[in-house]
């Protein structure tokens, strides 16, 4: 896997607030190698290290995308939800941005059953079948469809387990990370100063609370995935 240039700029990262961690008493000592200083009671991460790991992550996703691999992006906290959806759609990735249903990956057969039910209901709605049902039944099925859309809408075209999972918030998405570890699925994870850097395959030290920080990281990863997809299509 060759190294490429991903236009990762330290000044741009600083402007996005990527270096701001949590208050110093809410930290994981394992993050010590990634922290450069303390400022006004807050840990500051080393942006040079962040840039290196982000570049490695971009190399990895480019290489995977150029070989036709499938990606899943997960970020369910409110401030990340829209960013996750737009990034995933741009890069033609699957995504989960509302709620992670436990076992979504480890109990894949159950997820497949839910997805089939979702597809069937969507088809029935498009053909107008729901409108021909008694009002109460139609209302119940429409509510079910709305729930399935919220939880499964981003993975509706997923036909198997992903090859790489990108996780926006380690603490929030710990269940996802554990499922990936169990299944041996490689992970790329944003890690703030209260996280464990050893859990993901590539951990990117970054502020996982600021929208600008999340957006910048996802933008770089998505750009690399899109370049990889283009390379795959040309090879095909």
Swiss-Prot record:
Q: Which GO terms describe its biological process?
A: translation
**Any one Gene Ontology molecular-function term assigned to this protein's record:** structural constituent of ribosome
What subcellular compartments does it reside in? Plastid, Chloroplast
Which cellular component appears as one GO term in the record?
A: chloroplast
The record's PANTHER family line, in alphabetical order, gives:
30S RIBOSOMAL PROTEIN S2 PROKARYOTIC AND ORGANELLAR (PTHR12534), SMALL RIBOSOMAL SUBUNIT PROTEIN US2M (PTHR12534:SF0)
Q: What are the transmembrane regions?
A: none
Q: Does the keyword Repressor apply?
A: no
Query: What is any Pfam family matched here?
Result: Ribosomal_S2
* Keyword Coiled coil (UniProt): no
Q: Which InterPro entries does the UniProt entry name for this protein?
A: Ribosomal_uS2, Ribosomal_uS2_bac/mit/plastid, Ribosomal_uS2_CS, Ribosomal_uS2_flav_dom_sf
Which family does the record assign?
Belongs to the universal ribosomal protein uS2 family.
Alphabetical UniProt keywords = Chloroplast, Plastid, Ribonucleoprotein, Ribosomal protein
Task: State what protein this is by name.
Answer: Small ribosomal subunit protein uS2c
Q: Which residues does UniProt call coiled coil?
A: none
Listed PROSITE patterns: RIBOSOMAL_S2_2
Q: Which domain of life is it from?
A: Eukaryota
Organism expressing this protein natively: Phalaenopsis aphrodite subsp. formosana
Q: Which NCBIfam families match?
A: rpsB_bact
């Amino acid at each position: 896997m060759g190294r490429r240039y991903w236009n990762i700029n330290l000044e741009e990262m600083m402007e996005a607030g990527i270096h701001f961690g949590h208050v110093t008493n809410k930290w994981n000592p394992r993050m010590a190698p990634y922290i450069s200083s303390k400022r006004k009671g807050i840990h500051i991460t080393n942006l040079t290290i962040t840039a290196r790991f982000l570049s490695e992550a971009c190399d990895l996703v480019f290489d995977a995308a150029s070989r036709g691999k499938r990606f899943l992006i997960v970020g369910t906290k409110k401030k990340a939800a829209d960013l996750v959806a737009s990034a995933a759609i741009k890069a033609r990735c699957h995504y989960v941005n509302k709620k992670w249903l436990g076992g979504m990956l480890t109990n894949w057969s159950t997820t497949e059953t839910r997805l089939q039910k979702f597809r069937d209901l969507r088809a029935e709605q498009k053909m107008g079948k729901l409108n021909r049902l008694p009002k109460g039944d139609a209302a119940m099925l429409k509510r079910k469809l709305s729930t399935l859309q919220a939880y499964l809408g981003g993975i509706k075209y997923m036909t198997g387990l992903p090859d790489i999972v990108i996780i926006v918030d380690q603490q929030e998405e710990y269940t996802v990370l554990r499922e990936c570890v169990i299944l041996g699925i490689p992970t790329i994870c944003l890690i703030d100063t209260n996280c464990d850097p050893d859990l993901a395959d590539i951990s990117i030290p970054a502020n996982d609370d600021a929208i600008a920080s999340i957006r910048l990281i996802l933008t770089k990863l998505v750009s690399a995935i899109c370049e990889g997809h283009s390379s795959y299509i040309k090879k095909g």
